[in-house]
């Protein structure tokens, strides 16, 4: 009986010490300063989302460049916009965005691939619906090559972003994530141009391991509040340590 009592006492002390250590570590990292002294501010621009908001997308983009005077902008090449019909390539609107940024000496991150920002994430052209998966992949790689070939002489494009959060399966209407296909895309872009490749992943819903080890640069998100049609508003009370730990 005495042995059992001693064992329980030791276990209780050990659990208490462990609890104190965990709480202390949490408090330390929660209140620790993570201020970044050197960083660049930029914006993301989406033609389709501007239209969704019933804005004149060209006037909106010019206002962002001239009124906000941003020097870094992220643009996208949604598949359904640049190849609306098989082998019919339309770069007119994206060319306009790129040229307006170049006029003002704005640095560009260009997103390419099947998955680009904003719902439904995978902006598939209608003509790929029903095609065998291997054909879709073949066409996807061809689309990536076309985009890089079209823009690789634009010096203001500093970074290629290949896909947008490609390992995130919890959001968007997309096929399951495929790290091997992502690596194929990255390898293809590297063979076409030597600028760095950015891979992104969700700040709250992913572990970053696969994405962070695929490109030259890694980017993530930080959401404090999101809205879900079934659950309503969701609040992420996550300290900086949450992101620092994953990094």
Please name every model-derived segment.
Residues 46-52, 79-91, 126-138, 164-176, ...:
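The substrate-binding groove and active-site-proximal loops of carbohydrate-active enzymes
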Residues 1-20:
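N-terminal Sec-pathway targeting helices
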